[in-house]
Swiss-Prot record:
InterPro entries per UniProt: Ig-like_dom, Ig-like_dom_sf, TMEM81
One Gene Ontology term from the biological process aspect of the record: sperm-egg recognition
Stated name of the protein: Transmembrane protein 81
Lineage of producing organism: Eukaryota, Metazoa, Chordata, Craniata, Vertebrata
Tissue specificity comment: Highly expressed in sperm (at protein level).
Segment forming the signal sequence: 1-30
One GO location term (cellular component): plasma membrane
Topological domains, Extracellular: 31-226
Keywords: Cell membrane, Disulfide bond, Glycoprotein, Immunoglobulin domain, Membrane, Signal, Transmembrane, Transmembrane helix
Residues exposed to the Cytoplasmic side: 248-255
Transmembrane segments: 227-247
Membrane topology: Single-pass type I membrane protein
UniProt subcellular location: Cell membrane
Species, as recorded: Homo sapiens
The Ig-like domain, residue ranges: 83-171
């Protein structure tokens, strides 16, 4: 009985695997003549978006491909693309009274034309942040915000939203972190802190970097270093003299 039961189970399993193959596998696969002659358009090449954020362009090459696999009537077309509409934050530090400008205008917008976009500005005054809750509307309808005489009150984060006029689609958001400082608070003369070689490189000249030159130090730093050195030397000498006097007095008292 056990042998018969085992044989029955194995036979059933074999039939279960074999039957679908018999039913679903045709002897010949007939393709209609119209389908054999069909021609389709296929994208054979595509470039990446011209920008990493905001609205840009990409190019696609489309060809007609027939049953023989030959490409015909190939055309290259230019399409809009949007990889990411959030473009991060740019940081700026300027002095009080300086003229300065923040601009949303970039190469991708120039490609389409400025009139195709709507610009909306918001401001988080006094803080550097990307938290939407701290922003308030800022009156500026153009692609830029200009400060004729920047003041500390102008410090904060400016957010520029760029939308397509035709459908109000948001295609770009850019943050500007602006710090306005008084001139006596910090020295922003970057060129002064460069070495002689770095200054030449900054001017576009070729320099042999194997020859090292010491960075420029302001005169007041040299004076402070000299004063500290003299003060330390006087302190050491004075300490030695005081110790000698104390030792002499102690020896006299003992006698």
């Amino acid at each position: 009985m056990k042998v018969l039961a085992t044989s029955f189970v194995l036979g059933s399993l074999g039939l279960a695997f074999y039957l679908p193959l018999v039913v679903t596998t045709p002897k010949t696969l007939a393709i209609p003549e119209k389908l054999q002659e069909a021609v389709g358009k296929v994208i054979i090449n595509a470039t990446t978006c011209t920008v990493t954020c905001g609205l840009g362009y990409k190019e696609e090459t489309v060809c007609e491909v027939g049953p023989d696999g030959v490409r015909r009537k190939c055309q290259t077309r230019r399409l809009e693309c949007l990889t990411n509409w959030i473009c991060g934050m740019l940081h700026f530090t300027i002095l009080i009274g300086k003229e300065f400008e923040l601009s949303c205008l970039s190469s991708d917008i120039l490609e389409f034309g400025q009139e195709a976009f709507r610009f909306t500005w918001r401001l988080a005054r006094g803080v550097i942040s990307t938290d939407d809750e701290v922003f308030k509307p800022f009156q500026a309808n153009s692609h830029f915000v200009k400060f004729k005489y920047a003041q500390e009150y102008d410090s904060g984060t400016y957010r520029c939203d760029v939308q397509l006029v035709k459908n109000l689609r948001l295609v770009k958001r850019l943050y500007f972190g602006l710090r306005v400082l008084p001139p006596n608070l910090v020295n922003l003369n970057f060129h002064q802190s460069l070495t002689e070689d770095q200054k030449l490189i900054d001017e576009g000249l070729e320099v042999n970097l194997d020859s090292y030159s010491k960075p420029h130090h302001p005169k007041w730093k040299k004076k402070v270093a000299s004063a500290l050195g003299i003060g330390i030397a006087i302190g050491v000498v004075g300490g030695v003299l005081v110790r000698i006097v104390l030792c002499a007095l102690r020896g006299g008292l003992q006698q």
